[in-house]
């Protein structure tokens, strides 16, 4: 996928390939616990609730200016996150919107209060449900990144480097999380395999080299790139495995 349509967003990056970088990435994702069948049911329900709320927001924004402004500000927040490779603070968000922080806070509050009132809910409860959905979505993605790597390895030597394939497969995984319906009786790994494979094979077919990933994953990967760039700039040398391992808080010998 050359671009992500996810509601949590994505940011463009380029990998500098190499077995060392892949090894560090695998160490990092390997520390995430796998999900039980019960976990999948609970998390998928929260994700589906989140997706319904976001569809509802887009629909209501067509007729309610306060919600439309909230939606525009959220889209700006996402673009800024893509630019910064991390979710912006309220101050960074306000600067990007070119408005005072107080005005930003007021617009967000008014947007949520208007939205909540239209669906007979409470603003705090609405925001809590959205937060739960985002966290559930990220949890499902993080817990299945090892499956992405396993699938990507089957498609090596077809014109794209393994790390690029991993990124494309992650986008397929992201889509699977959005679509998964636990009531159909499938385990998520079975369901997501098709989406992961589709993301990878589509990328191979188009030979796409510019990849987009969810922000929470690019944050992790860009920490490595940042160390490489800082050491090259400040010390005039290439970052060692020890430097990168220290940044990721993993053992160099693991």
Residue ranges and their predicted role:
Residues 9-212, 216-230:
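Alpha-helical promoter-recognition and RNA polymerase-docking modules of transcription initiation factors
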Residues 95, 242, 246:
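Alpha-helical residues within the helix-turn-helix
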Residues 5-7:
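Short, contiguous pre-domain boundary segments
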Residues 1-3:
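Intrinsic, short, N-terminal disordered tails of RNA polymerase sigma-factor systems
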Residues 233-240:
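Short, charged, surface-exposed loops that flank catalytic or proteolytic processing sites
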Residues 245-254:
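Short, intrinsically disordered, charge-balanced linker/junction segments flanking boundaries
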């Amino acid at each position: 996928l050359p671009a992500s349509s996810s509601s949590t967003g994505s940011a463009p990056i380029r990998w500098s390939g190499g077995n060392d970088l892949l090894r560090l990435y695998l160490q990092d994702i390997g520390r995430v616990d796998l999900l039980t069948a019960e976990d999948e049911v609970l998390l998928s329900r929260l994700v589906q609730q989140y997706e319904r709320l976001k569809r509802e927001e887009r629909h209501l924004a067509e007729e309610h200016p306060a919600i439309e402004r909230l939606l525009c500000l959220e889209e700006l927040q996402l673009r800024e996150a893509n630019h910064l490779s991390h979710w912006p603070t309220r101050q960074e968000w306000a600067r990007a919107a070119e408005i005072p922080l107080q005005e930003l806070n007021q617009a967000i509050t008014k947007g949520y209060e208007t939205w909540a009132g239209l669906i007979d809910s409470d603003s705090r409860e609405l925001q809590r449900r959205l937060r739960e959905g985002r966290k559930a979505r990220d949890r499902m993605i993080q817990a299945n990144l090892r499956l992405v790597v396993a699938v990507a390895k089957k498609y090596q030597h077809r014109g794209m480097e393994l790390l690029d394939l991993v990124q494309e497969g992650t986008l397929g995984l992201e889509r699977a999380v959005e679509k998964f319906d636990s009531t159909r009786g499938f385990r998520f790994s079975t369901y997501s395999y098709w989406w992961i494979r589709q993301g990878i094979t589509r990328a191979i077919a188009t030979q796409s080299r510019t990849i987009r990933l969810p922000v929470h994953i690019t944050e992790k990967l860009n920490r490595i790139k940042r160390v490489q760039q800082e050491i090259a700039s400040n010390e005039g040398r290439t970052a060692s495995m020890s430097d990168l391992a220290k940044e990721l808080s993993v053992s160099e010998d693991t």
